[in-house]
Amino acid sequence: MKLFAIVGSNADHSYNRDLLNFIKKHFTDRYDIELGEVKDLPMFKEGVKEPAAVASFAKKVADADAVLISTPEQQHSVPSSLKSALEWLSSAEHPFKDKPVVIVGTSVLPQGSARGQSHLKLVLSSPGFGAKVFNGDEFMMGTAPEQFDENGNLPAGTVKFLDHFFDEFDSFYAEVSK
């Protein structure tokens, strides 16, 4: 399965980028994962012609079998850089229409990205997107700095849950892709 994985933060060092890199490495035999960076997109501005970087990003979303988004939580929601990218992606081409989407996330806070993920699911399910959002188990890892070791690996229990989480997503994908 070809996944376009969106790093939902514009931070130079992002634990969500670290999480996606771990997922890419861990599931290398299962998925073909390409990372996309919201930090490479300009801030959304209504009435402005879609920039080439946005068109390229939208094509990667459209060409993927499914989209994986890793988001932190900022002020009980998603970061403004991710929201801006979503504004671009809902303003013209609508590449998320009927696209299976799976959301993960991590944060330095104990609750992980719980509220950010909840808000993101609401946005992606709205009429401007129409994505098929996976609503099974949730992966929202808290206290990110304590989770990754010096090689970017995660604890065995976390990896076991991540395996289960993606097994559930694969079942969802098989169902919605019929």
Swiss-Prot record:
GO terms for molecular function: flavin reductase (NADH) activity; FMN binding. Its EC number is 1.5.1.36. Coiled coil: none annotated. It catalyses: a reduced flavin + NAD(+) = an oxidized flavin + NADH + 2 H(+). Keywords: Flavoprotein, FMN, NAD, Oxidoreductase. The keyword Oxidoreductase applies. Disruption phenotype: Cells lacking both LJ_0548 and LJ_0549 completely lack the NADH-dependent flavin reductase activity detected in wild-type strain, and show a 40-fold reduction of hydrogen peroxide formation upon exposure to oxygen. Reductase activity and H(2)O(2) production in this mutant can only be restored by in trans complementation of both genes. Pfam families: FMN_red. The keyword Oxidoreductase applies. GO terms for cellular component: cytosol. SUPFAM superfamilies: Flavoproteins. Requires LJ_0549 for activity, but the exact composition of the enzyme is unclear. Belongs to the NADH-dependent flavin reductase family. Component of an enzyme that catalyzes the reduction of free flavins (FMN, FAD and riboflavin) by NADH; the reduced flavins produced by this reaction likely spontaneously react with oxygen, yielding hydrogen peroxide. Is responsible for the major H(2)O(2) production in L.johnsonii in the presence of oxygen. Cannot use NADPH instead of NADH as the electron donor. This is NADH-dependent flavin reductase subunit 1. It comes from Lactobacillus johnsonii (strain CNCM I-12250 / La1 / NCC 533).
